[in-house]
Amino acid sequence: MRRVLTGILTATLLLLNTLVLIGPLLVFALFKLVLPGRGRDHASGAVMWVAETWSEIDKAIFALCTPTQWDIRGIENLRRDTSYLAISNHQSWVDIPALIESLNRRTPFFKFFLKKELIWVPLLGLAWWGLDYPFMKRYSKAFLEKHPELKGKDLEITKAACELFKRQPVTVVNYLEGTRFTEAKRQEQQSPYRHLLKPKAGGVAFVLAALGEQLDALLDVTIVYPGDKAPGFWDLLNGSVSRVIIDIQVRELDPALWAGDYESDPVFRQTVQAWVNQLWLEKDERIEQLRWE
């Protein structure tokens, strides 16, 4: 019963925070639509400030209501005046609060590439739209074979989003697995990794091609939860999550990673894929080490 009450209290406070701050965020987002040039940049900065304040209050709510220990590592030299590409393993909706706890007001506010269906999430869908989060429509290979005219649509969205990102410092978050990890998915994929699904290099390659010269570094984020199963969001709300490890390794980005054409150059494509696969091998080993803690 105590956990239920804790969950209800935490959820209520988070909802109240959302209701209070989504209004100002959307007002400034509308200013972005009508103001030109520097006016738009100032409005965009105001949107980011509201989002960061929203996130800081969410952090305070979790600290007040839940006993979760956020074990955050590798944040000592992060900066807010530069741009980053962040990659992370993906297991649960709790990954989002984990990124907020570790990156908010330590780096530029982060942007995700979201599934198009998420724009319909009450309140949050509007907030994500106001924050210029790109909404992607994912098509299966079989569907694209029947509708070849849709091939490359996500690339167009990625390029358009990255053009917006060039106007100010940004942290672009990319989940290379493309979906949340489960053991069933790992076995279905026949993934060679113990704790990860196979990575997809295409999305990160397009971000590098569009923003490479603007990016200061790669943030290699590894999130580990206690136990054999990742917690759900309700588990976080009701205080069932005792500890979350967020390990951040800052890596240099080789300019060669955006020096070619990923779509048309098979040699360059193999180079990027090999780089991603090596990152994933090291991340898999890192997860194993952190789980033993």
Language-model region placement:
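A Trp-anchored, charged/polar loop motif used as the substrate-binding/catalytic surface
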Residues: 150-163
